[in-house]
């Protein structure tokens, strides 16, 4: 009996620490997002519409030395072979890498420079058929970051 109770407490302890407390999972699911990975330091979710595929990673990383830029560089160097790197830029809110796939679609990697939560880093993969120019891309980045940040408590 003691082992059963201990096991239940251990399981509840693991479950309660699995997702970052600052992510509103109920709101995510209400807005048709699917939770892909739910761990203490990595939380991934995404959704696909007719025009856009969106995957978001929220990372809890204790290091602060320009981590957002490092994450952006990692995305660039770790991209799949079928994704051809096109360009890189940054605006006030994010580092953005642009890739073109063999099928003609475009993938935009968006890494937020700062978030309202300490040690929280947001990385977004935005896939679309559209080839955004700089001004258009800035609007997409702002809109997407605003939406993702709305799921943070």
Provide a role label for each language-model segment:
Residues 43-71, 121-127:
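A short acidic-to-branched-hydrophobic micro-motif
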Residues 38-42, 53, 103-111, 120-121:
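Short, surface-exposed coil-to-beta transition loops
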Residues 1-4:
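Positively charged n-region of N-terminal signal peptides that target proteins for export
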Residues 21-35, 67-79:
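Amphipathic alpha-helical segments
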Residues 6-17:
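Hydrophobic h-region of N-terminal signal peptides that target proteins for export
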Residues 78-117:
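Signature of long, low-cysteine stretches enriched in small and polar/charged residues
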Residues 24-34, 124-153:
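Surface-exposed amphipathic alpha-helical segments
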Residues 28-31, 47-51, 90-92, 113-121:
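Short, solvent-exposed coil/turn segments at beta-strand boundaries
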């Amino acid at each position: 009996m003691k082992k059963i109770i201990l096991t239940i407490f251990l399981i509840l302890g693991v479950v309660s620490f699995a997702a970052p407390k600052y992510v509103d999972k109920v709101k995510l699911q209400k807005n048709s997002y699917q939770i892909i990975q739910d761990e203490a330091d990595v939380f991934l979710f995404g959704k696909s519409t007719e025009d856009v595929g969106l995957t978001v990673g929220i990372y809890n990383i204790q290091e602060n030395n320009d981590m957002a830029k490092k994450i952006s560089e990692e995305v660039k160097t770790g991209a799949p072979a079928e994704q051809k790197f096109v360009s890189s830029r940054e605006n006030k809110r994010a580092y953005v890498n642009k890739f073109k796939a063999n099928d003609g679609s475009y993938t935009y990697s968006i890494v937020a420079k700062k978030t309202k939560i300490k040690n929280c880093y947001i990385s977004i993969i935005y896939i679309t058929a559209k080839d955004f120019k700089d001004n258009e891309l800035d609007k997409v980045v702002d809109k997407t970051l605003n939406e993702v940040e709305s799921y943070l408590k």
